[in-house]
Amino acid sequence: MEFSTQTTASLHQIKTAALAVGVFADGVLSAAAEVIDRASHGAVAAVVKSEFRGRTGSTLVLRSLAGVSAQRVVLVGLGKQAEYNARAHASAEQAFAAACVAAQVGEGVSTLAGVAIEGVPVRARARSAAIAAGAAAYHYDATFGKANRDARPRLKKIVQVVDRAASAQAQLGLREGAAIAHGMELTRTLGNLPGNVCTPAYLGNTAKKLAREFKSLKVEVLERKQVEALGMGSFLSVARGSEEPLRFIVLRHAGKPAKKDKAGPVVLVGKGITFDAGGISLKPAATMDEMKYDMCGAASVLGTFRALAELELPLDVVGLIAACENLPSGKANKPGDVVTSMSGQTIEILNTDAEGRLVLCDALTYAERFKPAAVIDIATLTGACVVALGNVNSGLFSKDDALADALLAASRQSLDPAWRLPLDDAYQDQLKSNFADIANIGGPPAGAVTAACFLSRFTKAYPWAHLDIAGTAWRGGKDKGATGRPVPLLMQYLLDQAG
Protein backbone atom coordinates (compact mmCIF):
# COMPACT_ATOMS: atom_id res chain seq x y z
CA MET A 1 0.00 0.00 0.00
CA GLU A 2 1.13 3.55 -0.74
CA PHE A 3 1.12 6.29 1.90
CA SER A 4 1.67 10.02 1.52
CA THR A 5 0.89 13.35 3.17
CA GLN A 6 -1.10 16.39 2.14
CA THR A 7 -1.28 19.84 3.72
CA THR A 8 -4.47 21.80 3.23
CA ALA A 9 -7.02 23.73 5.23
CA SER A 10 -9.66 23.20 2.55
CA LEU A 11 -10.65 19.67 3.53
CA HIS A 12 -14.09 20.06 1.99
CA GLN A 13 -12.48 20.54 -1.43
CA ILE A 14 -10.44 17.31 -1.38
CA LYS A 15 -11.65 14.93 -4.07
CA THR A 16 -11.44 11.39 -2.73
CA ALA A 17 -13.52 8.24 -2.42
CA ALA A 18 -13.43 8.43 1.39
CA LEU A 19 -12.42 11.15 3.86
CA ALA A 20 -11.97 10.25 7.56
CA VAL A 21 -12.68 12.78 10.31
CA GLY A 22 -12.63 12.07 14.02
CA VAL A 23 -15.44 12.47 16.54
CA PHE A 24 -15.01 12.11 20.31
CA ALA A 25 -17.50 10.18 22.44
CA ASP A 26 -18.72 13.28 24.24
CA GLY A 27 -19.90 14.79 20.97
CA VAL A 28 -16.84 16.99 20.47
CA LEU A 29 -15.77 17.23 16.84
CA SER A 30 -12.12 17.13 15.86
CA ALA A 31 -10.81 20.20 14.04
CA ALA A 32 -11.16 18.37 10.72
CA ALA A 33 -14.72 17.33 11.52
CA GLU A 34 -15.56 20.95 12.32
CA VAL A 35 -14.31 22.03 8.88
CA ILE A 36 -16.55 19.46 7.19
CA ASP A 37 -19.44 20.39 9.48
CA ARG A 38 -19.22 24.05 8.48
CA ALA A 39 -18.94 23.19 4.79
CA SER A 40 -22.00 20.92 5.02
CA HIS A 41 -24.03 23.47 6.99
CA GLY A 42 -24.13 21.46 10.21
CA ALA A 43 -24.78 18.01 8.75
CA VAL A 44 -22.00 16.36 10.78
CA ALA A 45 -23.08 17.87 14.09
CA ALA A 46 -26.68 16.86 13.41
CA VAL A 47 -25.73 13.23 12.79
CA VAL A 48 -23.47 13.14 15.84
CA LYS A 49 -26.25 14.52 18.00
CA SER A 50 -28.84 12.05 16.74
CA GLU A 51 -27.06 8.75 16.11
CA PHE A 52 -23.24 8.65 16.30
CA ARG A 53 -21.79 8.14 19.76
CA GLY A 54 -18.09 8.30 18.87
CA ARG A 55 -17.17 5.00 20.50
CA THR A 56 -13.52 4.10 19.83
CA GLY A 57 -13.20 2.48 16.41
CA SER A 58 -16.84 2.93 15.42
CA THR A 59 -17.62 4.38 12.00
CA LEU A 60 -20.51 6.01 10.18
CA VAL A 61 -20.39 6.72 6.45
CA LEU A 62 -22.05 9.88 5.14
CA ARG A 63 -22.44 9.93 1.37
CA SER A 64 -22.53 12.91 -0.95
CA LEU A 65 -22.62 15.66 1.66
CA ALA A 66 -23.60 19.02 0.20
CA GLY A 67 -20.61 21.35 0.05
CA VAL A 68 -18.07 18.52 0.36
CA SER A 69 -16.12 17.10 -2.61
CA ALA A 70 -15.38 13.71 -1.03
CA GLN A 71 -17.73 10.93 -2.16
CA ARG A 72 -17.91 9.63 1.39
CA VAL A 73 -17.17 11.27 4.72
CA VAL A 74 -16.36 8.58 7.27
CA LEU A 75 -16.99 9.64 10.85
CA VAL A 76 -14.57 7.70 13.04
CA GLY A 77 -15.06 7.36 16.79
CA LEU A 78 -12.11 8.43 18.94
CA GLY A 79 -13.59 7.57 22.34
CA LYS A 80 -13.59 9.94 25.30
CA GLN A 81 -11.48 13.01 24.60
CA ALA A 82 -9.78 12.90 28.02
CA GLU A 83 -8.75 9.28 27.42
CA TYR A 84 -7.63 9.61 23.81
CA ASN A 85 -4.26 7.92 23.38
CA ALA A 86 -2.03 6.11 20.89
CA ARG A 87 -4.03 2.89 21.03
CA ALA A 88 -7.31 4.71 20.41
CA HIS A 89 -5.71 6.43 17.42
CA ALA A 90 -4.51 3.11 15.99
CA SER A 91 -8.00 1.64 16.42
CA ALA A 92 -9.48 4.64 14.62
CA GLU A 93 -7.05 4.38 11.70
CA GLN A 94 -7.71 0.65 11.36
CA ALA A 95 -11.46 1.25 11.46
CA PHE A 96 -11.20 3.81 8.66
CA ALA A 97 -9.08 1.50 6.51
CA ALA A 98 -11.53 -1.34 7.18
CA ALA A 99 -14.39 0.91 6.07
CA CYS A 100 -12.49 1.65 2.84
CA VAL A 101 -11.92 -2.07 2.30
CA ALA A 102 -15.59 -2.84 2.91
CA ALA A 103 -16.62 -0.15 0.42
CA GLN A 104 -14.09 -1.52 -2.11
CA VAL A 105 -12.57 1.90 -2.74
CA GLY A 106 -9.06 2.29 -4.09
CA GLU A 107 -7.92 5.26 -2.04
CA GLY A 108 -8.80 7.34 0.97
CA VAL A 109 -7.77 10.44 2.89
CA SER A 110 -7.40 10.45 6.67
CA THR A 111 -7.13 13.43 9.01
CA LEU A 112 -6.72 11.25 12.10
CA ALA A 113 -2.91 11.44 12.42
CA GLY A 114 -3.35 15.19 12.71
CA VAL A 115 -5.25 14.84 16.00
CA ALA A 116 -2.69 15.63 18.71
CA ILE A 117 -1.91 13.13 21.48
CA GLU A 118 0.16 14.22 24.46
CA GLY A 119 3.56 12.54 24.41
CA VAL A 120 3.03 10.95 20.99
CA PRO A 121 4.74 12.87 18.16
CA VAL A 122 3.33 12.97 14.65
CA ARG A 123 6.02 10.58 13.39
CA ALA A 124 4.79 7.89 15.80
CA ARG A 125 1.15 8.61 14.93
CA ALA A 126 1.88 8.34 11.21
CA ARG A 127 3.83 5.11 11.72
CA SER A 128 0.94 3.64 13.68
CA ALA A 129 -1.53 4.76 11.00
CA ALA A 130 0.34 2.89 8.27
CA ILE A 131 0.65 -0.27 10.37
CA ALA A 132 -3.05 -0.17 11.21
CA ALA A 133 -4.06 0.35 7.58
CA GLY A 134 -1.87 -2.53 6.48
CA ALA A 135 -3.50 -4.80 9.05
CA ALA A 136 -6.99 -3.82 7.90
CA ALA A 137 -6.16 -4.42 4.23
CA TYR A 138 -4.54 -7.84 4.77
CA HIS A 139 -6.21 -10.60 2.78
CA TYR A 140 -5.24 -14.28 2.51
CA ASP A 141 -6.22 -16.35 -0.51
CA ALA A 142 -2.99 -18.21 -1.31
CA THR A 143 -4.43 -21.70 -0.97
CA PHE A 144 -7.94 -21.26 -2.33
CA GLY A 145 -8.59 -23.29 -5.48
CA LYS A 146 -10.24 -20.36 -7.20
CA ALA A 147 -9.41 -17.13 -5.44
CA ASN A 148 -12.28 -14.65 -5.36
CA ARG A 149 -10.65 -11.63 -6.95
CA ASP A 150 -13.67 -9.50 -6.10
CA ALA A 151 -13.01 -10.14 -2.40
CA ARG A 152 -9.48 -8.79 -2.60
CA PRO A 153 -9.19 -5.30 -1.11
CA ARG A 154 -8.86 -2.59 -3.71
CA LEU A 155 -7.45 -0.12 -1.21
CA LYS A 156 -4.00 0.86 -2.50
CA LYS A 157 -3.40 4.36 -1.16
CA ILE A 158 -4.08 6.41 1.97
CA VAL A 159 -3.15 10.08 2.27
CA GLN A 160 -2.70 11.65 5.71
CA VAL A 161 -3.60 15.32 6.06
CA VAL A 162 -1.20 17.04 8.48
CA ASP A 163 0.08 20.53 9.23
CA ARG A 164 2.78 21.77 6.88
CA ALA A 165 5.30 21.97 9.74
CA ALA A 166 4.70 18.30 10.59
CA SER A 167 4.81 16.99 7.03
CA ALA A 168 8.43 15.79 6.97
CA GLN A 169 8.11 13.87 10.24
CA ALA A 170 4.79 12.42 9.15
CA GLN A 171 6.30 11.21 5.88
CA LEU A 172 9.14 9.54 7.81
CA GLY A 173 6.65 7.81 10.10
CA LEU A 174 4.54 6.65 7.16
CA ARG A 175 7.61 5.19 5.46
CA GLU A 176 8.54 3.30 8.63
CA GLY A 177 4.99 2.12 9.16
CA ALA A 178 4.62 0.95 5.57
CA ALA A 179 7.78 -1.16 5.86
CA ILE A 180 6.57 -2.68 9.13
CA ALA A 181 3.17 -3.38 7.57
CA HIS A 182 4.87 -5.15 4.66
CA GLY A 183 6.90 -7.22 7.12
CA MET A 184 3.78 -8.13 9.06
CA GLU A 185 2.03 -9.12 5.83
CA LEU A 186 4.83 -11.56 5.02
CA THR A 187 4.83 -12.91 8.58
CA ARG A 188 1.06 -13.43 8.54
CA THR A 189 1.04 -15.17 5.17
CA LEU A 190 3.87 -17.53 6.14
CA GLY A 191 2.01 -18.38 9.33
CA ASN A 192 -1.30 -18.94 7.56
CA LEU A 193 0.13 -21.23 4.89
CA PRO A 194 -0.43 -24.93 5.65
CA GLY A 195 2.41 -27.16 6.77
CA ASN A 196 2.50 -29.06 3.48
CA VAL A 197 3.26 -25.78 1.68
CA CYS A 198 5.29 -23.80 4.19
CA THR A 199 7.97 -26.41 4.79
CA PRO A 200 11.51 -25.76 6.05
CA ALA A 201 12.63 -25.60 2.41
CA TYR A 202 9.89 -23.03 1.70
CA LEU A 203 11.20 -20.84 4.52
CA GLY A 204 14.70 -21.15 3.09
CA ASN A 205 13.49 -20.18 -0.37
CA THR A 206 11.58 -17.23 1.09
CA ALA A 207 14.79 -15.98 2.69
CA LYS A 208 16.63 -16.34 -0.63
CA LYS A 209 13.87 -14.44 -2.40
CA LEU A 210 14.24 -11.56 0.07
CA ALA A 211 17.98 -11.48 -0.61
CA ARG A 212 17.32 -11.19 -4.34
CA GLU A 213 14.89 -8.33 -3.73
CA PHE A 214 16.99 -6.30 -1.27
CA LYS A 215 20.69 -5.58 -1.76
CA SER A 216 21.42 -5.18 1.96
CA LEU A 217 20.52 -8.83 2.66
CA LYS A 218 22.79 -11.84 2.42
CA VAL A 219 21.38 -15.32 3.01
CA GLU A 220 22.93 -18.74 3.55
CA VAL A 221 20.74 -21.83 3.86
CA LEU A 222 22.39 -24.85 5.50
CA GLU A 223 21.16 -28.40 4.95
CA ARG A 224 21.53 -31.61 6.95
CA LYS A 225 25.18 -32.42 6.21
CA GLN A 226 26.28 -28.90 7.12
CA VAL A 227 24.22 -28.99 10.31
CA GLU A 228 25.75 -32.36 11.18
CA ALA A 229 29.23 -30.92 10.66
CA LEU A 230 28.40 -28.14 13.12
CA GLY A 231 27.46 -30.70 15.76
CA MET A 232 23.86 -29.53 16.19
CA GLY A 233 22.78 -32.82 17.73
CA SER A 234 19.78 -31.40 19.54
CA PHE A 235 18.29 -29.76 16.43
CA LEU A 236 19.03 -32.87 14.36
CA SER A 237 17.27 -35.12 16.88
CA VAL A 238 13.99 -33.28 16.32
CA ALA A 239 14.35 -33.10 12.54
CA ARG A 240 15.03 -36.81 12.02
CA GLY A 241 11.44 -37.68 12.96
CA SER A 242 10.20 -36.23 9.67
CA GLU A 243 10.81 -37.01 6.01
CA GLU A 244 10.80 -33.24 5.36
CA PRO A 245 14.43 -32.02 5.18
CA LEU A 246 15.57 -29.49 7.78
CA ARG A 247 16.97 -26.05 7.00
CA PHE A 248 19.17 -23.76 9.09
CA ILE A 249 18.80 -20.26 7.68
CA VAL A 250 21.31 -17.46 8.25
CA LEU A 251 20.32 -13.92 7.20
CA ARG A 252 22.51 -10.81 7.41
CA HIS A 253 21.40 -7.22 7.00
CA ALA A 254 24.52 -5.11 6.50
CA GLY A 255 23.20 -1.71 7.44
CA LYS A 256 26.48 0.25 7.60
CA PRO A 257 26.14 1.62 11.15
CA ALA A 258 27.05 5.27 11.57
CA LYS A 259 28.97 4.65 14.79
CA LYS A 260 32.72 4.21 14.28
CA ASP A 261 33.10 2.13 17.44
CA LYS A 262 30.40 -0.24 16.33
CA ALA A 263 29.33 -3.04 18.59
CA GLY A 264 28.51 -6.49 17.33
CA PRO A 265 25.26 -7.17 15.49
CA VAL A 266 21.85 -7.72 16.97
CA VAL A 267 20.92 -11.36 16.41
CA LEU A 268 17.30 -12.48 16.02
CA VAL A 269 16.70 -16.22 16.46
CA GLY A 270 13.40 -17.72 15.27
CA LYS A 271 11.85 -21.06 16.10
CA GLY A 272 10.82 -22.63 12.79
CA ILE A 273 8.83 -25.78 13.54
CA THR A 274 6.71 -25.79 10.39
CA PHE A 275 4.39 -28.40 11.86
CA ASP A 276 4.39 -29.67 15.43
CA ALA A 277 2.47 -32.87 16.07
CA GLY A 278 4.34 -33.23 19.36
CA GLY A 279 6.41 -36.18 18.21
CA ILE A 280 5.98 -39.40 20.22
CA SER A 281 4.42 -37.22 22.98
CA LEU A 282 1.54 -36.66 20.57
CA LYS A 283 -0.66 -33.57 20.87
CA PRO A 284 -4.48 -33.74 21.15
CA ALA A 285 -6.21 -33.88 17.75
CA ALA A 286 -8.81 -31.16 18.32
CA THR A 287 -6.64 -28.13 17.62
CA MET A 288 -3.58 -29.78 16.13
CA ASP A 289 -4.18 -27.97 12.83
CA GLU A 290 -3.07 -24.77 14.57
CA MET A 291 0.39 -26.24 15.03
CA LYS A 292 1.22 -24.97 11.55
CA TYR A 293 1.70 -21.71 13.48
CA ASP A 294 4.64 -23.17 15.43
CA MET A 295 6.96 -21.47 12.95
CA CYS A 296 5.69 -17.96 13.69
CA GLY A 297 8.95 -17.10 15.43
CA ALA A 298 10.78 -17.84 12.19
CA ALA A 299 8.11 -15.96 10.22
CA SER A 300 8.56 -12.90 12.43
CA VAL A 301 12.31 -12.94 11.80
CA LEU A 302 11.72 -13.01 8.04
CA GLY A 303 9.11 -10.26 8.31
CA THR A 304 11.45 -8.12 10.39
CA PHE A 305 14.24 -8.56 7.86
CA ARG A 306 11.92 -7.52 5.07
CA ALA A 307 11.10 -4.32 6.95
CA LEU A 308 14.75 -3.72 7.85
CA ALA A 309 15.82 -4.04 4.26
CA GLU A 310 13.04 -1.82 2.92
CA LEU A 311 14.08 0.94 5.34
CA GLU A 312 17.81 0.33 4.77
CA LEU A 313 18.21 0.70 8.52
CA PRO A 314 21.82 1.61 9.48
CA LEU A 315 22.30 -1.37 11.76
CA ASP A 316 23.97 -4.76 11.48
CA VAL A 317 21.43 -7.50 12.16
CA VAL A 318 21.74 -11.29 11.89
CA GLY A 319 18.79 -13.67 11.66
CA LEU A 320 19.00 -17.37 12.53
CA ILE A 321 16.17 -19.81 11.84
CA ALA A 322 16.20 -23.47 12.82
CA ALA A 323 13.46 -25.03 10.70
CA CYS A 324 12.11 -28.58 10.74
CA GLU A 325 8.98 -30.58 11.59
CA ASN A 326 8.26 -32.43 14.84
CA LEU A 327 6.51 -35.68 13.93
CA PRO A 328 6.24 -39.19 15.38
CA SER A 329 8.05 -41.91 13.44
CA GLY A 330 10.45 -44.79 13.87
CA LYS A 331 13.32 -42.29 13.81
CA ALA A 332 11.77 -39.70 16.12
CA ASN A 333 13.00 -38.81 19.58
CA LYS A 334 11.65 -41.04 22.36
CA PRO A 335 11.00 -39.93 25.94
CA GLY A 336 14.16 -40.72 27.86
CA ASP A 337 16.53 -40.23 24.92
CA VAL A 338 19.71 -38.25 25.60
CA VAL A 339 21.16 -36.00 22.89
CA THR A 340 24.26 -33.82 22.70
CA SER A 341 23.77 -30.16 21.79
CA MET A 342 26.18 -28.01 19.78
CA SER A 343 27.38 -26.53 23.08
CA GLY A 344 28.44 -29.97 24.30
CA GLN A 345 25.76 -30.06 26.99
CA THR A 346 23.71 -33.25 27.03
CA ILE A 347 19.92 -33.12 27.22
CA GLU A 348 17.49 -35.75 28.50
CA ILE A 349 14.31 -35.55 26.44
CA LEU A 350 11.49 -36.24 28.90
CA ASN A 351 8.81 -34.88 26.58
CA THR A 352 9.22 -34.79 22.81
CA ASP A 353 6.62 -32.01 22.59
CA ALA A 354 9.09 -29.66 24.26
CA GLU A 355 11.00 -29.57 20.98
CA GLY A 356 11.21 -25.83 20.36
CA ARG A 357 13.91 -25.43 22.99
CA LEU A 358 15.79 -28.35 21.44
CA VAL A 359 16.15 -26.57 18.11
CA LEU A 360 16.65 -23.11 19.62
CA CYS A 361 19.50 -24.14 21.91
CA ASP A 362 21.74 -25.05 18.98
CA ALA A 363 20.84 -21.83 17.16
CA LEU A 364 21.68 -19.84 20.30
CA THR A 365 25.07 -21.56 20.47
CA TYR A 366 25.66 -20.80 16.78
CA ALA A 367 24.95 -17.11 17.53
CA GLU A 368 28.15 -16.87 19.60
CA ARG A 369 30.29 -16.69 16.47
CA PHE A 370 28.92 -13.24 15.63
CA LYS A 371 30.06 -11.72 18.97
CA PRO A 372 26.63 -10.10 19.21
CA ALA A 373 25.66 -6.95 21.06
CA ALA A 374 22.36 -8.65 21.88
CA VAL A 375 20.48 -11.82 21.00
CA ILE A 376 16.68 -12.03 21.00
CA ASP A 377 14.95 -15.33 20.35
CA ILE A 378 11.32 -15.42 19.29
CA ALA A 379 9.31 -18.59 19.74
CA THR A 380 5.83 -20.00 20.13
CA LEU A 381 7.35 -21.91 23.02
CA THR A 382 4.88 -22.76 25.79
CA GLY A 383 1.19 -23.15 26.46
CA ALA A 384 2.08 -22.09 29.99
CA CYS A 385 2.77 -18.58 28.72
CA VAL A 386 -0.72 -18.47 27.23
CA VAL A 387 -2.16 -19.51 30.60
CA ALA A 388 -0.16 -16.78 32.34
CA LEU A 389 -0.63 -13.89 29.90
CA GLY A 390 -3.44 -14.87 27.54
CA ASN A 391 -3.49 -13.38 24.06
CA VAL A 392 -2.55 -9.79 24.93
CA ASN A 393 1.06 -9.73 26.13
CA SER A 394 4.00 -11.69 24.77
CA GLY A 395 6.18 -13.12 27.52
CA LEU A 396 9.59 -11.46 27.93
CA PHE A 397 12.44 -13.13 29.79
CA SER A 398 15.92 -11.69 30.32
CA LYS A 399 18.54 -11.28 33.02
CA ASP A 400 19.89 -8.20 31.25
CA ASP A 401 17.90 -5.26 32.63
CA ALA A 402 19.03 -2.83 29.94
CA LEU A 403 17.95 -5.16 27.13
CA ALA A 404 14.67 -5.99 28.85
CA ASP A 405 13.91 -2.31 29.47
CA ALA A 406 14.64 -1.46 25.82
CA LEU A 407 12.32 -4.21 24.60
CA LEU A 408 9.55 -3.20 27.01
CA ALA A 409 9.85 0.42 25.89
CA ALA A 410 9.62 -0.73 22.27
CA SER A 411 6.58 -2.85 23.09
CA ARG A 412 4.78 0.13 24.58
CA GLN A 413 5.61 2.49 21.74
CA SER A 414 4.72 -0.04 19.04
CA LEU A 415 1.45 -1.03 20.77
CA ASP A 416 2.74 -4.63 20.62
CA PRO A 417 2.74 -5.35 24.36
CA ALA A 418 5.07 -7.64 26.26
CA TRP A 419 5.29 -8.45 29.97
CA ARG A 420 8.49 -9.35 31.77
CA LEU A 421 8.38 -12.64 33.66
CA PRO A 422 10.93 -13.97 36.19
CA LEU A 423 14.09 -15.86 35.34
CA ASP A 424 15.39 -16.61 38.83
CA ASP A 425 18.14 -19.21 39.25
CA ALA A 426 15.95 -21.06 41.76
CA TYR A 427 13.82 -22.34 38.88
CA GLN A 428 16.84 -24.09 37.34
CA ASP A 429 16.52 -26.88 39.91
CA GLN A 430 13.41 -28.11 38.11
CA LEU A 431 15.57 -28.98 35.09
CA LYS A 432 17.86 -31.41 36.91
CA SER A 433 18.30 -34.80 35.28
CA ASN A 434 19.71 -38.04 36.70
CA PHE A 435 21.03 -39.00 33.27
CA ALA A 436 22.17 -35.82 31.47
CA ASP A 437 23.36 -32.28 32.07
CA ILE A 438 19.81 -30.94 31.76
CA ALA A 439 16.25 -32.17 31.26
CA ASN A 440 14.16 -30.60 28.52
CA ILE A 441 11.16 -30.00 30.81
CA GLY A 442 10.79 -28.99 34.44
CA GLY A 443 7.34 -30.31 35.29
CA PRO A 444 4.01 -28.44 35.39
CA PRO A 445 4.89 -25.51 37.70
CA ALA A 446 6.09 -22.33 35.96
CA GLY A 447 6.38 -24.00 32.56
CA ALA A 448 7.10 -20.79 30.64
CA VAL A 449 9.79 -19.85 33.16
CA THR A 450 11.55 -23.22 33.12
CA ALA A 451 11.51 -23.19 29.30
CA ALA A 452 13.30 -19.83 29.39
CA CYS A 453 15.66 -21.20 32.05
CA PHE A 454 16.53 -24.05 29.70
CA LEU A 455 17.42 -21.61 26.92
CA SER A 456 19.46 -19.47 29.30
CA ARG A 457 21.92 -22.36 29.70
CA PHE A 458 23.04 -21.69 26.11
CA THR A 459 23.32 -17.88 26.27
CA LYS A 460 26.18 -17.19 28.66
CA ALA A 461 28.33 -15.44 26.03
CA TYR A 462 26.11 -12.42 25.30
CA PRO A 463 23.15 -10.28 26.45
CA TRP A 464 20.02 -12.29 25.70
CA ALA A 465 16.24 -11.99 25.79
CA HIS A 466 13.52 -14.50 25.01
CA LEU A 467 10.08 -13.64 23.64
CA ASP A 468 7.44 -16.33 24.12
CA ILE A 469 4.77 -15.51 21.53
CA ALA A 470 2.62 -18.62 21.95
CA GLY A 471 -0.37 -16.49 22.93
CA THR A 472 0.11 -13.60 20.52
CA ALA A 473 1.36 -14.99 17.19
CA TRP A 474 -2.06 -16.16 16.03
CA ARG A 475 -5.74 -16.18 16.90
CA GLY A 476 -7.94 -19.26 17.03
CA GLY A 477 -11.67 -19.65 16.54
CA LYS A 478 -13.74 -18.09 13.77
CA ASP A 479 -11.13 -15.35 13.24
CA LYS A 480 -8.29 -17.86 13.04
CA GLY A 481 -5.14 -16.44 11.53
CA ALA A 482 -1.64 -15.17 12.16
CA THR A 483 -1.31 -11.70 13.69
CA GLY A 484 2.13 -10.60 12.45
CA ARG A 485 3.31 -10.03 16.01
CA PRO A 486 5.92 -9.31 17.29
CA VAL A 487 7.26 -7.63 14.14
CA PRO A 488 6.19 -4.14 15.37
CA LEU A 489 7.97 -4.66 18.70
CA LEU A 490 11.16 -5.96 17.06
CA MET A 491 11.22 -3.18 14.48
CA GLN A 492 10.64 -0.48 17.10
CA TYR A 493 13.53 -1.90 19.13
CA LEU A 494 15.79 -1.87 16.06
CA LEU A 495 14.68 1.65 15.08
CA ASP A 496 15.57 2.78 18.60
CA GLN A 497 18.98 1.08 18.37
CA ALA A 498 19.68 2.72 15.02
CA GLY A 499 18.85 6.11 16.51
Swiss-Prot record:
MF-aspect GO terms: manganese ion binding; metalloaminopeptidase activity
InterPro entries (alphabetical): Leucine_aapep/pepB, Macro_dom-like, Peptidase_M17_C, Peptidase_M17_leu_NH2_pept, Peptidase_M17_N
Function per UniProt: Presumably involved in the processing and regular turnover of intracellular proteins. Catalyzes the removal of unsubstituted N-terminal amino acids from various peptides.
Organism: Bordetella pertussis (strain Tohama I / ATCC BAA-589 / NCTC 13251)
Binding sites annotated in the UniProt record for Mn(2+) 1: 276, 353, 355
One GO CC term, this protein: cytoplasm
Record's cofactor remark: Binds 2 manganese ions per subunit.
Cofactor(s) required for function per UniProt: Mn(2+)
Coiled coil: none
EC number: 3.4.11.1, 3.4.11.10
Pfam families: Peptidase_M17 (PF00883), Peptidase_M17_N (PF02789)
Active site per UniProt: 283, 357
UniProt xrefs under Gene3D superfamilies: Leucine Aminopeptidase, subunit E, domain 1, Zn peptidases
The protein's name in its UniProt record: Probable cytosol aminopeptidase
EC supergroup of this enzyme: hydrolase
Designated gene of the protein: pepA
UniProt-listed GO biological process terms: proteolysis
Family per similarity comment: Belongs to the peptidase M17 family.
